């Protein structure tokens, strides 16, 4: 048994949750806890099927507090966790077999002064025929594994991170972010993200994680111009242009369109404030 509790946040994830839990089975975690925010599809039924199948899976329903950071912090504060380590996952994410093996071998060997483990995220885009977008995005390093009692959510509205005070180490292998939603669903989801990111920016929230300095520099640039600069860096300097049509399309939508609508939402919010 691996001395880790996996916390998975879900909400209408019938397309993803079975894959996530099936991949976790090989980890042999002490606990797998799914926190649902009132799913209205088959998510809950699928989870209970996996409870019967694997035994270690637990289900908790908690009303959506408005953002992922607050939901995860609720889980940390209220769940009965007995393991020494905690791993945080979304339903559309899963561990590669290589990462499972690495965690099982390395986790017992981590020094006592290490509080967190940084994982490498591989981004696979379902609406681009399951393309793995590498240049300009891989690897994204993110702290997802930490000692019980040593990690906390940064409580940001958008792009939340786990914060630890002690040392961190990095693993060699990947976990995969592979959403199966359609292109239209992706756009609708990112319009919502744009509103939250604009709200986060205007409220003065400071970024955390390894991208904090880059994000601070980005927001010092003029609106809209910075979106073009961001796209240009991803497309030309980081080599997306060399990866083919799928990478071009992803870079356009995620690297330019999304950043553009964030700036549009910031402008709309500023104008609304000035009129009130």
Model-predicted segments: where are they?
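A conserved acidic beta->alpha catalytic loop
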Residues: 23, 36-46, 64-65, 90
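Conserved donor nucleotide-binding strand/loop of the catalytic core
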Residues: 44-78, 82
């Amino acid at each position: 048994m691996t001395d880790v509790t996996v916390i998975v946040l879900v909400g209408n994830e019938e397309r993803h949750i079975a894959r996530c839990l099936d991949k976790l089975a090989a980890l042999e975690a002490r606990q797998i806890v799914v926190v649902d925010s009132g799913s209205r599809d088959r998510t809950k039924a699928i989870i209970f099927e996996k409870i019967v199948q694997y035994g270690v899976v637990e289900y908790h329903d908690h009303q959506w507090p408005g953002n992922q950071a607050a939901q995860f912090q609720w889980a940390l504060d209220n769940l009965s966790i007995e393991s020494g380590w905690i791993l945080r996952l979304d339903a559309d994410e899963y561990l590669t077999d290589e990462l499972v093996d690495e965690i099982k071998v390395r986790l017992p060997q981590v020094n006592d002064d290490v509080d967190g483990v940084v994982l490498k995220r591989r981004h696979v885009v379902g609406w681009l025929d399951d393309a793995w977008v590498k240049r300009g995005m891989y690897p994204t390093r993110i702290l997802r594994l930490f000692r019980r009692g040593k990690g906390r959510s940064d409580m940001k509205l958008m792009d939340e991170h786990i914060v630890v005070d002690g040392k961190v180490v990095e693993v060699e292998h990947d976990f995969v972010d592979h959403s199966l939603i359609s292109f239209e669903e992706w756009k609708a989801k990112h319009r919502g993200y744009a509103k939250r990111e604009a709200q986060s920016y205007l409220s003065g929230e400071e970024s955390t994680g390894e991208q904090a300095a880059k994000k601070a520099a980005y927001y010092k640039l003029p609106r809209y111009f910075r979106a073009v600069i961001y796209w240009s860096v991803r497309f030309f300097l980081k080599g997306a242009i060399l990866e083919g049509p799928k990478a071009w399309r992803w870079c356009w939508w995620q690297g330019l369109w999304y950043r553009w609508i964030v700036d549009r939402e910031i402008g709309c919010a500023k104008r609304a404030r000035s009129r009130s």
